[in-house]
Amino acid sequence: MSVANPLRKSIKCVILDLDGTLLNTDGIVCNVLKVSLGKYGKEWDGRETLQIAGKTPFEAASAVVEDYGLPCSPIEFISEISPLFSDQWCNIKALPGANRLIKHLKSNGVPMVLASNSPRESIDAKISFHDGWKDSFSVIIGGDEVRTAKPSPDIFFEAARRLCMEPSSCLVIEDSLPGVTAGKAAEMEVVAVPSLPKQSHLFTAADEVINSLLDLQLEKWGLPPFTDWVEGTLPVDPWYIGGPVIKGFGRGSKVLGIPTANLSTKDYSDLLSEHPAGVYFGWAGLSARGIFKMVMSIGWNPYFSNKEKTIEPWLLHEFSEDFYGEELRLVIVGYIRPEENFPSLESLIAKIHEDRRVAERALDLPMYSSHKNDAYLRSS
């Protein structure tokens, strides 16, 4: 990840993209395209995901129609899928850190603009399901309200004009390449939060690339810093996952000396897609053994080049025997850091043990220790 030089410019406002930056739209898009392409005897395989990210609805529809050889025009395809999308807007969840960021900037009097390639009507419909969002933005601009959509800088110039601010005093937060390109063309500072996995290397034009909004450090840009980090940890809304313990890759104990208790992701792929890759912690309940402190990684483990997103919890207790097949319940209550690659196995192991120490200390704090009594941990 690239790192911004602290306080390079005095930032006075923040311009945010919507889909993929604040809202987890990707899953809805995939589901709608699976249904729509199925009607034509086609199967959505995700190959257009990068090409359509950040594009206008017409551009995205054109790419899908051409690539899959559909017997319809882009306009006709949009007419077919628009009702399907409208039915799903109520189900789109805010991405981790989105509500936190909006509330923090609003409470500190930092003007915010919502600037999306989506039509204005679509933007209003989506954010109507998220309390307080509409009133938090000083300006909302849709792609149909400017002459040329991103990657043209028009939408960002318009945002600065409506706020009566110089473009150089604006910080753009974007998840897609068109958005980053547009922000830099407007001579604004740009933080990229890639919504697609393993694509950070494509965002070299951005001033900073971060893993998720949870990792945003506003003080780098002269903005009021977050104050909710506690002893190297960030509290998150608790989330839950469980199932029988399965055999993993066999490298936890043998290669790393760290015995992880692996869970199948088959039934939790949608849940895992909602959470950024990184290191989390919380409590683990084993049906026949009790409740234990836990630290875990979510992601692709770049050192080992995993092909699929996995979850690998480490129960912070010495067990005398394996417990494959036993029911394991996890309550995740905090975040430590983003996923990262390491130059050596030794540095990876050292970092994992540091994560353990951070988690063990944090879980003694009342704000985290209270979750040890969560009924989910004792369910079977």
Language model segments and positions:
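Asp-based, Mg2+/Mn2+-dependent phosphohydrolase catalytic module
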Residues: 1-12, 103, 119-236
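Active-site neighborhood of HAD-like aspartate-dependent phosphohydrolases
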Residues: 2-50
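Substrate-recognition element of Asp-dependent hydrolases with the DxDx(T/V) motif
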Residues: 21, 33, 80, 98-128, ...
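Short beta->alpha linker loops
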Residues: 28, 52-56, 80, 93-97, ...
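Helix-loop "lid/cap" segments that line or gate small-molecule binding pockets
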Residues: 36-37, 56-71, 126, 160
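Short helix-capping segments at alpha-helix termini
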Residues: 39-42, 68-72, 131-136, 164-165
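Metal-dependent phosphoesterase signature
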Residues: 43, 63-100, 108
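Phosphate/ribose-recognition catalytic cores of enzymes acting on nucleotide-derived substrates
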Residues: 239-380
